[in-house]
Amino acid sequence: EHTVQVVRRELADPRTLEWPLQCGLTVIAAHSGTKSGLFDPQYFHHFVEMTRRHPRLYGDISAFNVPIRGSVVPRCLQKPLVERMVHGSDYPVPVFGHWAWLQGFVDWKAFRQWERQPNVLERDYQLKRAMGFPPETFTRISRMLRPSLPAKSA
């Protein structure tokens, strides 16, 4: 991929998030610990293990419509991990539906339809829905950013 320069490759490892998680913060791991380039380390297995220990750890699904990251999609769609996924777009990185089509997530007609969609955020959303990510993946962030407040006493 390498659309954006990676400054400190070691920070892609979700284990660097242990301290904030131990302090009780809610944390979203970028790309759910998946690798960026062909020769980069794959940290997804660490992310999955960490979600078992840290209920406030989430992973974003930005750039999941590329082969190098998309290979983890089937695992991300399984419970309980799917409940820890949140939408991320990686905008302005371009979104293409080739991988979703080649993997059978979308048929040729849907692929062509979304490839012509000029709104890249809409294209990204529709392709990820076609890949199987449930609606909650795209709305979960609102609960995380605005936790419910205690009821006012009368």
Predicted regions: what they are:
Residues E1-Y43:
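Divalent metal-binding pocket/active-site signature
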Residues T26, G33-A154:
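H/E-rich (His + Asp/Glu) clusters that bind or coordinate divalent metals
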